[in-house]
Amino acid sequence: MFAEIVIAPEPAQERFRQTAGKERRESCMMLSCSDLDILRLLRWCRMIRSKELYETFSKYEVMNLCAAQMIRFSEAAKAWYLTPCGNRVLGSSGFALPSAKAPTYREPDITRRLRLAQIVTTAYAAGVNIFLTKESELRSQPSLFLPFLHRNRGSNPWGSTRVAALLHTGNLMCAIHWVSPNIGCVALTDELTAFQNHTASIPAKQRAIIFAASSYEEILAELDAGQEIQNTRLQTYREVYDCLKLPLFLMPCNDTGCLQLRIIGVPNYRELLARIILKSHYVPPPADRAMYDALYQGVPFVMAADMDLRRIDAAVEAARSDGLSQIVLAALPEQVEPVLNRRYRETGKARVFTITESALRELLGSTAPYAPPDLPFYTSEGSVLDVPPLKAP
């Protein structure tokens, strides 16, 4: 007796069962689009924690793939990874894939992979195409490319730069950096040069930087640490935050970060959301106040859902120079309590309001995270894919 795994639409199931009965095979497992995406995510990320997988897919789907011996949980890494069986299934699926790598058990490598997986699963839930194998594929959007896929022995076009991912969405081309307590220092000039060189051919109106971590609190803990360094070539992320000329967004790798990515993926999202929120009270900002998104009853209004805190600070300073003691902020509920109230409302710098669900639906259509089609998997040619008999890994 041996088992065969078949990726096929439902009409093919009975034909397979008849064949399996004649050849004394065990019953097949039908792989869905969700199943294939789980396998592909693990190929791209190398390993993913249960938390991220269960939030993105169902635990039932994950455990089914485990029972089929296509994925396995590592007690050492406390994360899921692909087995040789899972890699063989992917190899027969027709998708372009990054090279398969053996699992790593070095703690620094595990930490980097799991952080990267948080960024990737957040982007996936936001409807971003994360399954890119070449930088040139960033021309389509929304899309996310992982530079580490091109870091190989003897070939490392990204050098020692620390960019975790490149994101092309809406009008923005973003370099994403993981910023959490004790993350270390960065050579900003090298980072910006690599960012420009590797994305120069990708059309985007604005380049930006995203600082990502598990929560806003983690990012701000590092930015507020105030470390001093002796190496003048390197800078702390706080120093980068203070001197960077590009827009800089803070993003948590969770549901709020997913919604934030969807918002910035809408071209001209700042003006559109300001108009939706203020309705008939909307007044365009003065031409010399680019940090404002509108005037609300004569008061500067800033749409803060993108979490560009430096733009908020600039708006506060500009308002004070105009003789105004406060501005008005609008943001997502999960941004208001942990960050904006403490920094702006409680210090008297701003009145802070929560963006309503109806306003978000008007901008986005739906606030629900992306979910793959609840359908069996077809190849790109529209045919059934029969995977050869697979031995247990």
Predicted regions and their residues:
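Short amphipathic alpha-helical interaction segments
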Residues: Y54-F73
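A short, highly charged nucleic-acid-interacting micro-segment common to nuclease
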Residues: R43, A100-A117
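Short alpha-helical segments that sit at the start of domains
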Residues: F2-L36, R106-I110
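Terminal low-complexity, intrinsically disordered regions
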Residues: D37, L65-A67, A77-A79
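Electrostatic, structured charged patches in enzyme active sites and in nucleic-acid/phosphate-binding
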Residues: E4-Q13, A117-P393
